[in-house]
Amino acid sequence: MMRLVRYCMGAAMFASACTPALKLTPSDAPTVLAHQVLEAADPGLPGPYEVLQLYYGSGTDKNRVEYRDSVAITTEPVDASKLVSLGGAADSRNEYWGFTPKEMPLNARVWYPKGDGPFPLVLVVHGNHSMRDFSDPGYDYLGELLASRGYILASVDENFINGARAENDARGWFLLKHLGEFEHFNEEEGNPFEGKVDMSNVALIGHSRGGEAVANAAAFNQLTHYPDDASLTFDFDFDIKGIVSIAPVDGQYLPTGRGVVVEDMSYLTFHGSHDGDVTSFHGLRIYDRLRFNDSGDFRFKAAVYVYRANHGQWNSVWGSGDIGPRSARTLDLRGLIPQVDQRRFAEIYVSSFMEVVLKGRQEYLPIFRDHRVIGQWLPSTMYITRFETNAFRPLATFEEDIDVTRGTEDGVSLRGVSLSTWREATLMLRSSNRPTTSASQENQAVTLGWNNRIAGADTTRHRPAASYSVELGGRLAARWALGRQHSLEFMLGPTDSTPRP
């Protein structure tokens, strides 16, 4: 007994000596989240509908009983051979799954409300993970919540392309094929979804590689041909109103060497500061590329950075192990917020997004403009947000040319006085998953520096005070019909460098 006690004490002392103190940024949550301004009902709570569940798929799955013996609707396989290449692993993968890319299944688990409908349709797709540790059950919490609030949610099975290379175009294409199935379900007499699917109100959610895949799907939805092989034709054109990217990658799929551009739909992305897999907020790149060309129907885009959230806890299967079974040896998991809190955040924001985009409930829009309006609902951590609507008109994005004095809109001029630093450059991400495609935010900004000390060798007291101005042309206000209801917005951030004298 004494040996055991001494051994345990020694182990405790060893662990204490080898484990550094946890370093976290002091939280402003007690102040920032102290108030509740929004008077709408909590969107993260279950709604009035009884939730039903079913599976659809091949009915022949070798590895999962739900897609073999439990399918309520049988679907036909699709030929994905132009989009999926298994390389040297083809034989072993085909043996494990029992099919090749020429006959890949359309499988999904569906949560839906009991009732006549029609109900808006939401698809969610996972990202890359061990193909044997099935990822599609991991969004059950979103399925249960959204179905109770009057949505049909299908968690799409794409485990059979996990571990393959250069497959993220296929990941998006599969989503569109699933939408085609729901269109058929809605029209087929005797189908459980007959007449219950509102195909005019569709949204997509993706996590990790799935977060980029929903952007690919949104782009493919408007195309007639596959960009990498025009012999594959597209005929989709579904009414996708919005997409959500959870901790997404970006740059896995680069058609013609360029990032995919999403157009004319609402967008939400969120990412955790303690993401141990996708270590930078790549969703900001999709956010910045997104274009609002049509000023008719209201649309918006929003981004939220969540302090102490990781990559895997958005999926109940993945959990805290962002880099696999050895995560606890490499990552300090003590700093993570609890999974229940991370999922609570996702429930609030995803549900609010669907309420605004698919049901037109504008009372939830302030959540995206300023998270502080729901301080009493949010988990106690820190958040950084961005927000923009299709009413936004840029004066200066610093993207168009190398002239630092010219703005984006005709007639806008930029002027600096007594600045020690004045340059335009590309913003960088905090880290790079892949140096060739992941180091840049793909977003330009102007960097300004000044020194207004009134004494010392580096004084500027003999010069005018430093200033930077954005000057609007004389007719711009009239051309844009500007009035008191409009506001001027600047996005500012400090740097860690010191300006020159």
Say what each PLM segment does:
Residues 22-29, 36-43, 308-311, 317-474, ...:
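Alpha/beta-hydrolase-fold serine-hydrolase catalytic core, especially in secreted/extracellular enzymes
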Residues 260-339:
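Active-site-adjacent alpha-helix of alpha/beta-hydrolase-fold enzymes
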Residues 118-127:
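Short beta-strand element of the alpha/beta-hydrolase
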Residues 225-248:
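A conserved short beta-strand
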Residues 213-217, 278:
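Hydrolases whose catalytic domains are alpha/beta-hydrolase-1, hotdog thioesterase
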Residues 134-154:
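Short amphipathic alpha-helix adjacent to the substrate-entry channel of hydrolases
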Residues 22-117:
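Short conserved active-site loop signatures built around small residues
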Residues 115-117, 166-212, 220:
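Gly/Ser-rich "nucleophile elbow"/oxyanion-hole loop immediately N-terminal to the catalytic nucleophile
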